[in-house]
Amino acid sequence: MASQSSKPQSIYDFTVKDAKGNDVDLSIYKGKVLIIVNVASQCGLTNSNYTDLTEIYKKYKDQGLEILAFPCNQFGGQEPGSIEESIQNMVCTRFKAEYPIFDKVDVNGDNAAPLYKFLKSSKGGFFGDSIKWNFSKFLVDKEGNVVDRYSPTTTPASMEKDIKKLLGVA
């Protein structure tokens, strides 16, 4: 977590929990372009988003793209099971996701994860300060700055131009 004495400057100032409850310092992603997304396994957007996320990850992981997926049960109770059930049954088996899936978080409200408070404060604007639904996406540059925010209905494939620009891929 970011220290209480200083305001976080980038996502690298945060530590989150992985799916097994271990601390992960996000500074390990320095130099990577990131898509940070809140996910759910029982949402109408699940199939298209996980399929697209997996495709875009396979296409650009070797150029420095990482996807950080955070399960969330705040929207229609669409991520109800344990994190282990969700990951094993849905993400890894069905969608063959190779990118990291983290511990379940709240993205809105008093108990929102500090990372999500930072993401929302960095890119609120048109979207306001709250996450509207599952599969809201944040694009982060190689320095850990939040560059853009995409709605749940924006497909990962339609983010490709922005991703390529940050990766420096022609």
UniProtKB/Swiss-Prot annotation:
Subcellular compartments: Cytoplasm
Reactions performed catalytically: a hydroperoxy polyunsaturated fatty acid + 2 glutathione = a hydroxy polyunsaturated fatty acid + glutathione disulfide + H2O
Keyword Electron transport included in the entry's annotation: no
MF (Gene Ontology): peroxidase activity; phospholipid-hydroperoxide glutathione peroxidase activity
Keywords linked to the UniProt accession: Cytoplasm, Oxidoreductase, Peroxidase
EC number: 1.11.1.12
Gene Ontology cellular component terms for the protein in this record: cytosol
Keyword Cytoplasm: yes
Gene Ontology terms: biological process: response to oxidative stress
Main location: cytoplasm
Active site: C43
Principal EC category: oxidoreductase
UniProt superkingdom: Eukaryota
Chain's role: Protects cells and enzymes from oxidative damage, by catalyzing the reduction of hydrogen peroxide, lipid peroxides and organic hydroperoxide, by glutathione.
Family: Belongs to the glutathione peroxidase family.
The protein's name: Probable phospholipid hydroperoxide glutathione peroxidase
Organism: Gossypium hirsutum (Upland cotton)
